[in-house]
Swiss-Prot record:
It is found in: Cell outer membrane. It comes from Neisseria gonorrhoeae. This is Outer membrane protein P.IIC. This protein serves as a porin. The lineage of its organism: Bacteria, Pseudomonadati, Pseudomonadota, Betaproteobacteria, Neisseriales. One of its GO terms (molecular function) is porin activity.
């Protein structure tokens, strides 16, 4: 818990410093007023699972993030809305986004021989019995970056034209939810191979299914990110915005969750 508290304190301190810079810029530039922005973003989501070393201090730590979510590479398209204030060269904004739920299914089968009974002998007509166990394993998992509520400080470069590149920093409070449901079904099969050359005969019997394993967790973290992009002033109050942002959602137990986003949107200044 201590690293999380340190990250939160550092994030708030960093934000206060940036916002104070924006306030000073407002007094110098005269201010330009509030604005709203709507974006459509394409997000590449990266989930990386780290395992503690056998001799490490966290070797006995149980993670609330299932091994099911290991090295996931997925993507989604989602909307984002922002409300902010334009000070001239500096902008501050609060944004909110919801992400698409990631779903995945895994199905595996393993077959193990339990018993082999060879009843054939020299000069005696017999048959061969083989008893096997078939285990079917079905897993259904979801990983959902439910929402991200962020605060950003952005600096616009004045190029003397309608094009204005910008860079910025972002602090965000993210909510991630994930769950796994796992079911196993075992079937015992006895296969008979007649010695007279006839076709084999198989008899199967399903064992009582094991209780389903269900795991569900909800995690909230404060993370940091960077922003870059280019704005094009269509009118003095309307701007076409193309941007990129990288966000590290913070460490979710022994899992790292990061997003790379490219967006296209419109910004209107009042």
């Amino acid at each position: 818990m201590q690293p999380a508290k340190n990250l939160l304190f550092s994030s708030l301190l960093f934000s206060s410093l940036l916002f104070s810079s924006a306030a000073r810029a407002a007094s110098e530039d005269g201010g330009r007023g509030p604005y709203v922005q709507a974006d459509l973003a394409y997000a590449a989501e990266r989930i990386t699972h780290d395992y503690p070393k056998p001799t490490g201090t966290g070797k006995n730590k149980i993670s609330t993030v299932s091994d099911y979510f290991r090295n996931i590479r997925t993507h989604s398209v989602h909307p984002r809305v922002s409300v902010g204030y334009d000070f001239g060269s500096w902008r501050i904004a609060a944004d909110y986004a919801r992400y698409r739920k990631w779903n995945n299914n895994k199905y595996s089968v393993s077959i193990k021989e339990l018993l082999r009974n060879d009843n054939s002998a020299s000069g005696v007509r017999g048959h061969l019995n083989i008893q096997t166990q078939k285990t079917e394993h079905q897993e259904n998992g979801t990983f959902h970056a439910v929402s991200s509520l962020g605060l950003s400080t952005i600096y616009d470069f004045d190029t003397g034209s309608r094009f204005k590149p910008y860079i910025g920093m972002r602090v965000a409070y993210g909510h991630v939810r994930h769950q796994v449901r796992s079911v196993e079904q075992e079937t015992e099969i006895i296969t008979t191979y007649p010695s007279n050359g006839g076709g084999k005969v198989s008899l199967s019997s399903k064992m009582p299914p094991k209780s389903a394993h269900h795991q569900s967790n909800s995690i909230r973290r404060v993370g940091l990110g960077v922003i870059a992009g280019v704005g094009f002033d269509i009118t003095p109050n309307l701007t076409l915005d193309t941007g990129y942002r990288y966000h590290n959602w913070g460490r979710l137990e022994n899992t790292r969750f990061k997003t790379h986003e490219a967006s296209l949107g419109m910004r209107y200044r009042f």
